[in-house]
Amino acid sequence: MCGIVGYLGKKHDAYPILIKGLKRLEYRGYDSAGVALINEDGDLSVYKTKGKVADLEEFCTDKDITGHIGIAHTRWATHGEPSSVNAHPHYSQSKNLAIIHNGIIENYAEIKHNLMEKGIEFQSETDTEVLVQLIDYIQTKKNLSLLMAVQVALHQVIGAYAIALLDKRHPDTIIAARKQSPLVVGIGDGEFFLGSDASPIIEYTDKVVYLDDGNIAVMKLGEELKVVNILNEELSPEVQTVDMNLGQIEKGGYPHFMLKEIFEQPACLTNCMRGRINVEHDRVTLSALIDHRSKLLNAKRIIIVACGTSWHAGLIGKQMIETFCRIPVEVEYASEFRYRNPVVGESDVVIAISQSGETADTLAAVELAKSRGAFIYGICNAIGSSIPRATDTGTYIHVGPEIGVASTKAFTGQVTVLTMFALALADAKGTVSHDEYTKTVKELAQIPAMIKDLLKVNDQIADMARTFTYARNFLYLGRGFSYPVALEGALKLKEISYIHAEGYPAAEMKHGPIALIDSDMPVVAIATHNGMYEKVRSNIQEIKARQGRVIAIVTKGDTTISQIADAVIELPDTMDCLEPLVATIPLQLLAYHIAICKGKDVDQPRNLAKSVTVE
């Protein structure tokens, strides 16, 4: 949700690094921003404002922004409205400490009440200020070091957090801690960097430590990184090399990250398949299925847990796995699964899908399933994130950093991995014929080229979008493998254009949504040449009979539906099971161009965050 950045060193001024880091984290979504710095005189200054990082920069133009140590933050409101007062960093009452925090302190009201009874005054409505006031109170009352005060305070806290803390009495130290919220320490030559993920760090160093739950990091100038737990037991941090370059997170000439990421999909899916699909022998090989063959082959049931777009990918995966592997598959919202005491056990495989690998509900669902003895398989994009570290095995989608808040290439990457998983497992189980297996593998390998050709419809869709910006509601229809694509298309439109949209199975239209159809409600119908073609064509005729306006997604060469639809987008002809990978592309572009026509911020839509690390 929020973005955390920190810097400590003598090579650079902290402020430019912090601001640049916040801009790299803008994709996560936020409503306010702030920075805390300790200057050479030992003064601790906090500057913060509602709005964008650019607003913070403007606010700081006449401020003292000197110093070689600092922390910075972008906030997405959870406790307290978006405002300068509620923005981070927060001072303690003594103004000796400043803190930034990502997460939710569940028992903050109780702690706040106790502190107020002791005379502590609060300036904001946030749970974060409660934490810094608690640390300051413990440090003063018990005469403890900052580290020990943090450890004692965190013992009292219930909830999730990633924090970074400055103490003006120790202008050479940053203390950071995490629990259920990501935090990465970058290690440079005599300097330290801190980030919610690696994107603010990689310009300066590729050596990082991903903090685990319960870790507290002490970054002190002139010393090695020290990592301890809440009991002050010293740990040995694993230093990893980040395989990401700066060019991967720049716009590359595109006006928006979202459009760039839509157009990256041919290359991304090629990368996703690299080393996994042997085109010469028409084989799919996933190391996870080799290493854990027995556990996966003997699964009685597969449960997919995910949120948002990843849940839609899971719906496609369900159909794929059931079709090829003949194993029952359930797809659950992780946020529901974790709280409803599900029936899950040792004979189950749970597949957890998350772009960021940090989705709080999905991570909690993983922990619940693990506690019941299930085998956990992760499908993530962010290497080294929490979910891959919590699972038994898994597969990275390898589509590179996704900066736009609305997921595009991560979705197609997830569907590609689920397709490869289904094919590899079916081949191992013997539940798919040789001909069907090889045909599907061959066709899957051609998908990147199909998408590359399909992206030529961008200008056509941009023109089409202008026709439909008037709409206040959209209906998306699909059947079979296309139904989850309809759901995903509707979600994309909602996310970035703020137009209400619903995805429905086309056959269910007559059970309610048909009552809404009139000349003011566009309907996007996925009507490709699959087994449901005639039925969807009938649905389109029902819509037209009620003056509905139809945008039809059809197979190239279709001459029937083009005669009755108001607008037509053609797809390359491919197998039914692979159709989601191509059908989703024009829906991504349609959502993008409608949002642009309406003047919306497509990369950072309101109220949304890229990585949902709180419940």
Language-model segments: which ranges?
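Generic C-terminus detector
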Residues: 258, 549, 562-564, 574-615
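Active-site phosphate/pyrophosphate-binding segments
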Residues: 265-303, 393-522, 595-615
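Glycine-rich phosphate-binding loops that contact phosphosugars or nucleotide phosphates
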Residues: 297-439, 443-446, 526-567, 590, ...
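Glycine-rich oxoanion-binding loops at beta->alpha junctions
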Residues: 72-85, 280-293, 317-353, 359, ...
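Conserved short alpha-helical segments that host acidic/polar catalytic motifs at enzyme active sites
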Residues: 1-251, 255, 267-301, 339, ...
